[in-house]
C-alpha cells in the first residue's frame, strides 16, 4: 500500500538548470550555495541568487533543498549555524547534511529548518536511520549500495514520520556512497569537499616500477583498462517496487550535467511516476520513456545494487559518455502573426534536419523545419552560431523552454 505519491527530485546546478527542472515536472530541486557544497566545479548560487531561486521555486508550488554536505573544517563549522539561519530566513525548505555533529548543531541552531541526511552519510540500516531521526533528521537519503530487500526492511522498521529518499538515476561512484580519496591522493583535489576529478573514469594500464614504459596486458580496448569506471544508474522501470517499499522521494543525480539532461530526466521520471501512481499494481514503464532516458549523455545503464550485487557494473570499453542526441535550440516564444517559433540556438543545424520537439509535461513530437529565419527576418539555410536567436515556421505556439533535439550522426 503506497500512502503518498513519491516526490520527483531533480538537480539544479545553476539558474538555467533550475528552470528546466521546474518546467519539466520536478516536485522539488536540490542545489548548492557557495559554502558547504559537494559540487565545487559547478557555478553554485550566491546568496542573492539563492533567494531568487527560492522565490521562483515557491511561485511554482515546488520545494527547494540546499546541500550542506561537505566534510567541514573547524572554520566552516563556526560559520554553519549563521549560514543555516540565513537560508532558513530565505525560505529554503530543507538543508542536506552528512555529518552527525552538523546535524545536531543545525537542529539546535535552527530547530524549524527541515534536515535531510545526505547519501554521503552512508545510511544502510534502520537503526542508523532511526537514531538520526531522533537527533533531528526529517529524511534520510539512503546509500546507493542497498538492495531492494534491505530498503523494504529499513522502511518497515523506521518511525513513520521519517522520510526515505533514494537515487533512481545518474552517475554512480566506485566508493561506498561517494566517500573516496582517489582524487585527493592523485591530484590534491578532495572529492569529499566537492572537487572530485573523477580518476575512476581515467584510462589505466599496469606497469612494473623497474620496467618503466612497459605495459602489461590487463586492457579492454588494446591500450588501457577502465576497471574503476562504474555504469550509470537507471531505475525508471522499477519505481513501483521502490514506492511499495516505502520510498518517499525519487532522486536524480546530476547537478553538474546540462540543462538538457535535467529537463529530459525530470520529464521522464515525472511521466513515469504519474503513470505508476495511477495504477501501482500494473505499472510497466512505456518503451518511449525507456528510450527517452537514453537520449541524454550517459554511460551504459545498470540497476546498481537494487537486485543484489551488480554482475557487470563497470564500463570496460570507455571512460566517456554515450551521446546520440544533442540540443539544436530552445523555444523562447511565438510570433502569432507570422506563425513562427522564436528560438535560441544551442548547436548548429539546418533546414531539413529532422527534429524532436521535447515539450514540458507534454511528451515529444517530431518535426522537420522547411524554413529558418535569422533575427533580422532573413531566410537562412542553417543556424551556425552559438546562442544566436532564430525563427522557425510552426503552426502553433509551443511552451517556453521546449527543446529542439536532433540525432548526432
Feature map (PLM): residue ranges:
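Short active-site loop/helix that positions an aromatic residue
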Residues: 104-107
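Gly/Gly-Pro- and Ser/Thr-rich, intrinsically disordered tail segments characteristic of DNA damage-repair
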Residues: 78, 112-124
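Phosphodiester-processing cores and adjacent nucleic acid-binding clamps
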Residues: 51, 64, 83, 97-98
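Alpha-helix capping/helix-boundary segments
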Residues: 17, 101-102
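Surface-exposed amphipathic alpha-helical tracts and adjacent flexible/coil segments at the periphery
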Residues: 1-23, 28-31, 35, 54, ...
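Short beta-strand elements of ligand-binding domains
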Residues: 66-67, 97, 117-119
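Glycine-rich, positively charged N-terminal anion/phosphate-binding segment
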Residues: 39-56
